[in-house]
Regions:
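An acidic/histidine-cluster motif and surrounding catalytic segment
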Residues: 1-106, 110-230
């Protein structure tokens, strides 16, 4: 997903890493949704009338009655950037449905470190979403996440690294495989509970079948600015 010059350069690095590792993917570059194109993205997804329901500041933090989860706002200078990021991911999910194919979603900061052959993973997976990314430096409590995941080789459930009512999912959402069936479940959940940051929505409490894999296939490129905290 690309939305500026820095993202374009980073995307070239992703493509180069795909070639270097011999990863079996055919890249499709999807222009990212921006604050200026949020309305267009919502129209494409038929999500008109679906509100953002995740806390925007500390005054809204607390228990979400629909899900029973304890939600904490993300520090974001421009909330529209966070919404745009979510819509970009939702458009990727819709693309999986339209193609009727399992796809790999890559944010602009992803980088392959090992050869990925998707069929090697999909023959064993249970649910339809697999996190591919090294958690270290990419998620909350990343060392604990890594310690638990690296103790077992292969596909495994998302580890618990926090209290049971705190959303816990993939190690950041910069790289994950998703099936059309899972994509439909995610979009249906958005319609049911409203829009959340994609990494909060994709949590083990709402989708117990989420999986991660070790050894990892991707890491994040260093030094890139976040498009969601600005």
């Amino acid at each position: 997903m690309v939305n500026n010059h820095e993202s374009t350069v980073a995307t070239r690095m992703i493509i180069e890493s795909i070639k270097k590792t011999g990863t079996k993917l055919e890249p499709i570059i999807l222009p990212a949704t921006t604050p200026q194109t949020i309305g267009e993205g919502i129209d494409q997804l038929n999500m008109n009338g679906v509100a953002w329901t995740y806390p925007l500041d500390e005054h809204q933090d607390g228990l979400d009655l629909k899900t029973g989860l304890r939600l904490t706002h993300y520090k974001t200078e421009n909330h529209s950037n966070r919404v745009a990021c979510m819509i970009s991911h939702m458009r990727c999910w819709q693309k999986s449905i339209e193609l009727n194919q399992t796809i790999v979603v890559l944010e602009h900061d992803a980088l392959f470190t090992d050869t990925l052959c998707p069929e090697d993973l999909t023959s064993e997976w249970k649910g339809g979403i697999i996190g591919l990314n090294d958690p270290r430096g990419a998620t909350r409590r990343s060392q604990e996440f890594h310690r638990k995941v690296s103790s077992y080789v292969g596909l495994q459930p998302v580890p618990s690294v926090d209290d049971w009512d705190v959303p816990q999912g993939l190690a950041g959402n910069s790289a994950y495989m998703i099936s059309p069936k899972a994509a439909k479940k995610l979009l249906n959940k958005v319609k049911a509970i409203g829009m959340w940051p994609n990494d909060a929505l994709m949590c083990k409490q709402l989708f117990p079948w989420l999986e991660v894999v070790y050894p990892y296939y991707t890491t994040i490129q260093k030094g890139l600015k976040s498009t969601t905290t600005q």
